């Protein structure tokens, strides 16, 4: 009987999918479940002074990861591109927008070099 209950719980447990967004999905509408995660992967090059700035409603998402991973490159090479990974976990059901801008923080009032917008529907 215990094995049956364990198996039934295992079959009905929630599955958290990870939805990956890149620059290619700019202006896309993403439909996700409440238990899913969003992972945004963007190329960046910190040596240029540019950085991705993210805007999202903090009552709708929590930031669960924000890392920069160097792309493979020859040893000793500097100024090589990296991948920034931002992972968000939904906090509530609804429709919202995530915006990103690639800019230099000291260049106030200047438009970002690149801008991305994702619409997200959380069910």
Curated annotation (Swiss-Prot):
Changing residue 47 to T: Decreases inhibitory activity towards model target papain. It is found in: Cytoplasmic vesicle; Lysosome; Cytoplasmic vesicle, Phagosome. One of its GO terms (molecular function) is cysteine-type endopeptidase inhibitor activity. One of its GO terms (cellular component) is lysosome. Keywords: Cytoplasmic vesicle, Lysosome, Protease inhibitor, Signal, Thiol protease inhibitor. A motif (FG loop) lies at residues 105-114. A motif (BC loop) lies at residues 45-50. Belongs to the protease inhibitor I42 family. Cysteine protease inhibitor. Inhibits cysteine proteases CP1, CP2 and to a lesser extent CP5. This is Amoebiasin-2. The lineage of its organism: Eukaryota, Amoebozoa, Evosea, Archamoebae, Mastigamoebida.
């Amino acid at each position: 009987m215990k094995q049956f209950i364990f198996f039934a719980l295992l079959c009905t447990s929630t599955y958290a999918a990870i939805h990956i967004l890149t620059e290619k999905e700019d202006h896309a509408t993403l439909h996700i479940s409440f238990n899913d995660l969003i992972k945004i992967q963007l190329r960046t090059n910190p040596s240029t002074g540019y950085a991705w700035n993210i805007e999202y409603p903090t009552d709708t998402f929590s930031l669960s990861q924000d890392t920069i991973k160097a792309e493979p490159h020859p040893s000793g090479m500097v100024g090589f591109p990296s991948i920034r990974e931002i992972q968000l976990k939904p906090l509530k059901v609804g429709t919202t927008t995530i915006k990103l801008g690639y800019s230099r923080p000291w260049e106030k009032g200047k438009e970002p070099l690149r801008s991305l917008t994702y619409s997200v529907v959380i069910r």
